[in-house]
Amino acid sequence: MIFIVVKFPIRPDKLDEWERAREEHTRGARSEDGCLFFDYSQSVDDPNEYVLVEAFRDDDAAVHHVNSQAFKDFVERMPDIVSGHPQIINAKIDQDGFGPMGEISPRQS
């Protein structure tokens, strides 16, 4: 699995444009074969920072995403929306998705 986390610093006056770009990018990515998950969240410390957590089945699926029209359109829009360089973690993980967390289980009634 290719696991990616990206932090996007967004210009406060561009939040509406960011929301549109983010929604279109998400729709496109989630429709791609090999996309395991693709989720954005807003930072609890900085309302102008958003974090993308995404994963792809393998290298081919990740390359397909980067070559997709949705990704290209998103990248083209970003220079006017971001306030700094997005920061990325990109790692290959020997898993194929989520598994159960051993430390927490639902309490039985």
Could you describe each region identified by the protein language model?
Residues 2-9, 39-66:
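Short, well-ordered beta-strand segments in beta-rich or mixed alpha/beta enzyme
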Residues 2-40:
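N-terminal first-folded block
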Residues 24-37, 55-90:
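An amphipathic, aromatic/His-enriched active-site/gating alpha helix that lines ligand/cofactor pockets
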Residues 40-48, 76-109:
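Glycine-rich beta-strand-turn "strand-cap" elements at beta-sheet edges
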